Curated annotation (Swiss-Prot):
Identification of the protein by name: Probable 4-amino-4-deoxy-L-arabinose-phosphoundecaprenol flippase subunit ArnF
Membrane topology: Multi-pass membrane protein
GO cellular component: plasma membrane
Keyword Protein transport: no
Topological domain ranges for the Cytoplasmic compartment: 1-4, 66-74, 125-130
Biological process, per Gene Ontology: lipid A biosynthetic process; lipopolysaccharide biosynthetic process
Keywords assigned by UniProt, alphabetized: Cell inner membrane, Cell membrane, Lipid A biosynthesis, Lipid biosynthesis, Lipid metabolism, Lipopolysaccharide biosynthesis, Membrane, Transmembrane, Transmembrane helix, Transport
Membrane-traversing stretches: 5-25, 45-65, 75-95, 104-124
Periplasmic domain ranges by topology: 26-44, 96-103
Major localisation: membrane
InterPro entries: EamA_dom, Flippase_ArnF, Small_drug/metabolite_transptr
Function per UniProt: Translocates 4-amino-4-deoxy-L-arabinose-phosphoundecaprenol (alpha-L-Ara4N-phosphoundecaprenol) from the cytoplasmic to the periplasmic side of the inner membrane.
Disulfide bonds: none
Length: 130
């Protein structure tokens, strides 16, 4: 169940990141805070609160994951959010994200590193010391 909590935390933090990106594209600059009170910005402000709530919920899930998983297995899973956010940002036309070969290689290296860390090697090096 620890991996489930960790993956749910990653999903929430990734959704929060995408939501906050969209919100910041639709709100006035931070220097014009008084404009944020304009009723025309009610929807983006509500989504901003939703994004922040997703971050808080993500932390709660992360705490649950840490109760059940060793840190050396749980912490690398956070890098999945880089992969998820990059992939999802490409699918949102409004973000106008570009995907280059070097970014693809970066995502592939993250995935490869996760496999090396999280999958058991089955060799002597994986047995715990006493």
């Amino acid at each position: 169940m620890g991996y489930g909590w960790a993956l749910f935390s990653v999903a929430l933090v990734s959704a929060a990141q995408l939501l906050l990106k969209w919100v910041m594209m639709h709100l006035p600059p931070l220097g014009a805070l008084r404009l944020w009170l304009d009723p025309a910005y009610a929807e983006p402000l509500a989504l901003l609160m939703g994004g922040l709530l997703a971050y808080v919920c993500s932390m709660g899930c992360w705490f649950m994951a840490l109760r059940r998983l060793p840190l050396n297995k749980a912490y690398p899973l956070l890098s999945l959010s880089y992969v998820l956010v990059a992939a999802c940002a490409l699918m949102i036309p409004e973000f106008n994200e570009r995907f280059t070969f070097s970014r693809l290689m970066g995502v592939a290296l993250i995935c490869g590193g996760l496999l090396l860390i999280c999958l058991p090697a089955g060799g002597k090096g994986d047995t715990p010391r006493r």
